[in-house]
């Protein structure tokens, strides 16, 4: 698995994506999320892949197992490197997602890695307990979902840096801990509640980090990406 910082292409459309990517003269690991995918469809994935970039397709599927199986079977044909579902969909749904990817991956190609979202990094413990009616601490909920994800034979989870070490202890070092909410020191948190710096995420046990506005909103995105990469790889 590519371990470069994952750049979140959280742009409204194709033009903005390629205006941003033209600044870079190296293969990147990028995230295509719901906003961009819903505007541009699967073609945006194909076009980004044609430029030589690895793609994390961040659609967070959460539906009945049969529907998720069929959706993943289709997504596997796009040649993405990493995809995800919501762990709250349950073990049968996660297993169906994995089966769909295996069924849809073209012969001779590597199946995309599959991970599950535990709790969104925008979710606070109070919000989880009052709105989701989960009578656990936030970390206990995340660890529960991580165990469930591992039982379903997925490759890892999306989590905040605050749970990464505990997940590694429970699920093993090879179990991916993909961490969004990454900011440079002094950067705004925006709508994320549980955030960290790249070097902080490394210390706390993240396997992969997802960086958005710290780079995409920078006056010099290439320089910002270099700083993020150096902090992450130090």
Swiss-Prot record:
Homodimer. Substrate binds at residues 10, 31, 58-67, 121, 183, 192, 212-213. One of its GO terms (cellular component) is cytosol. InterPro entries: Aldolase_TIM, OMPdecase, OMPdecase_AS, OMPdecase_bac, OMPdeCOase_dom, RibuloseP-bd_barrel. Catalyzes the decarboxylation of orotidine 5'-monophosphate (OMP) to uridine 5'-monophosphate (UMP). CDD domains: OMP_decarboxylase_like (cd04725). Gene3D superfamilies: Aldolase class I. GO terms for molecular function: orotidine-5'-phosphate decarboxylase activity. This is Orotidine 5'-phosphate decarboxylase. It comes from Lysinibacillus sphaericus (strain C3-41). The active site is at 60 (proton donor).
């Amino acid at each position: 698995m590519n371990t470069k910082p994952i750049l979140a292409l959280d742009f409204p459309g194709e033009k903005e994506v390629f205006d941003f990517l033209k600044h870079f003269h190296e293969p990147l690991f990028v995230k295509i999320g719901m906003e961009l995918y819903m505007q541009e469809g699967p073609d945006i994935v194909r076009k980004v892949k044609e430029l030589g970039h690895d793609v994390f397709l961040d659609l967070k599927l959460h539906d009945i197992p049969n529907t998720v199986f069929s959706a993943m079977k289709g997504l596997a044909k796009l040649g993405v490197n990493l995809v995800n579902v919501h762990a709250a969909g349950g073990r049968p749904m996660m297993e169906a997602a994995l089966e769909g990817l295996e069924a849809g991956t073209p012969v001779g190609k590597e199946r995309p890695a599959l991970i599950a979202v535990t709790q969104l990094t925008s979710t606070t413990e109070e919000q989880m307990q009052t709105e989701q009616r989960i009578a656990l601490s936030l970390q206990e909920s995340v660890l529960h979902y991580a165990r469930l994800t591992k039982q379903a034979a997925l490759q890892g989870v999306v989590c905040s840096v605050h749970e990464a070490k505990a997940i590694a202890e429970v699920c093993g070092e090879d179990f991916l801990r993909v961490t969004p909410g990454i900011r440079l020191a002094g950067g705004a948190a925006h709508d994320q509640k549980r955030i960290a710096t790249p070097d902080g995420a490394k210390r706390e046990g993240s396997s992969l980090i997802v960086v958005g506005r710290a780079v995409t909103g920078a006056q010099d995105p290439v320089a910002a990406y270099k700083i993020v990469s150096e902090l992450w790889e130090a």
